[in-house]
Amino acid sequence: RQPNIVLILADDLGYADVGAYKADRYQTPNIDKLAKQGVRFTAAYAAAPVCAPSRAGLLTGRYPQRFGFEFNQGPGNREFKEGYGLDAKELTIGNVLQTAGYKTGLVGKWHMGIADQFYPTNRGFDEFVGLLTAETSYGDPAQPGVRVWPKDRAAAAAATKDGVFHRWPHAKILDGPSRTPVTDGKEYLTDYLTNRSVEFIERNAKSDNPYFLYAAYTAPHSPHMVVQKYYDRFPEIKDELQRINAAMIASLDDGVGR
C-alpha cells in the first residue's frame, strides 16, 4: 500500500512566527515537533510573494510565470474575472495522485479560480470544502468573545446577514461541487477546517486505498480575528494586533496537533 499524505499549508505565517525558527513570542509546540522529527528546508523559497501564484507553484511543481498565473484575484485587480485561474492544462499533485489510486481531498483555501473549470473537484480533488478566494471571516464578530483588529472590520462583517466578511463574492465556505454554503459563523473557522480535515482522515483511514489531504488553512491571514479561548493564552502581550496574531497562530498549531 502507498503511504497516506497530509500536506498542511499555513497562510501568511512568518519565518519568525514559529518556535522551530526561534520565535520568542508565539507558541507552536506541534509545528515544532514536526520540525524536530522531520526536515527543515531553511533555503526554500516560495514560487511567488503572493497567495494565488505561490499556491499554483506548490501544487503544480512549476513556476507560475510559465503558465501565466502571476497575480492574485481581488476586486482591485484586473484579473478578478471568472476566466482567470490555474490553466486547465496544468496538472496538480491531486491529478497525479488520483491517477495513482489516491482518494484526494482539499479542506480550506483554494484561491486559484472561481469558475467551474477551476473548481477543486475539477482539478484533482475528489472532495472539497473551503473558500475559493483569498479570505473570509473566521467567525461572527457579533458572537460574545470574538476579538477583531481593527474594530472597523468587525462592523463590516457584522453587517452581513450570515456573519461572513464579504470583500468580494464567493467568500463563503462551500462544500462539494454543489457549492453549498456550510458555516454560519458560530464555529471559529480554523477549528472548523481542522475538524473537517480530521473527519476526512478518519473516514479514509478505513479504506484499502491511500489518501491525500491538502489542508490549506487561512490562518493567520487577515482578517485578524480570534475567539476568547485562544486570546486568553497571551495576557502578557499588550499590543492588541500582536496578541490576536499570536492567538490565531496558536489555533493553527492546535489544529496541526490534532
Description of each model-found segment:
Residues 1-258:
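Formylglycine-dependent sulfatase
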